[in-house]
């Protein structure tokens, strides 16, 4: 059996949803899975995160350059957490044959603080399943790194069983600092996971990482399964990643429990004269659940509201919501920054989604700079409804109706000059 066929079979066994962006060397995997085409890699990963929140394992297949496009949700996943496993299957074009640059995707493991698995000919099936298990255990996206040498090689077919062990998103009772502290604790656990992982065979001599030859085998390439004593010499396909990271150790862990709103003593909430407060209160009262974005809408994840499930970075709410809550709340700037591609994809596929765009003509949550762009100018394809934030009756009607397909509502409001987020004692 060829490595490409083994990876396809293993993914079909371990995952429920597949998204793919063709490109050498993973086009055959995308086709073999009949993966859903997506407008870009960032949107594909956000769809997968939405699947995760809904209890579905999801795989996103892309070539090395595509990993650059989805860096934001990849990094954010560890802080926000997830439920069912999400794995980015990335093919590295090492020559390159069909790429404009040579890239080693393993470095994203360090940047995003996520596990990276690089199977060899004897560990294709087990390596795929382990990537999903690690994603669930450590509540973050996993990376499965593939190379042409593995995909073209004759490999061993094993019978690894699927064992779902869903994780949990970060507790909404945690502050942002508390979520980061939680992420750090889980990240430090990756080191013991790698060192104790049975997929590795560290017996001395020259170690081969992934499909590279060696007397020992390294599969969990980030974090590496040993230091210089265990891995004195390493053969690798690409840059000397494992050799460079043999000395990496877990970070110093704070003895304090992750910070909660209760331990901090207050919640942060919207400005006192926020024009959208009526909408937010209505969503809370009706127990609406939504994917929310970076910016003011992220405050909806607070226990004060209990509306937002998670936020995976700027522009993420639309694709995440399309595969989970079917409701997204996003700011006008976030939409134009990097959310509009997801909205295009949602309308192309007619995915049910109520997309609520907060038009306050502000660029940032902290700076409040005036925006130069009006989203209405660029949303002709969506035929959006424009509703004043003060028209709570109309907004109430829109929240009541089931969404048969995509509906975009621009809620128009003007932020108070000099307004600042308020705090509420716990």
Role assignments for model-derived ranges:
Residues 17-20, 24-103, 107-110, 114-117, ...:
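Thiamine diphosphate
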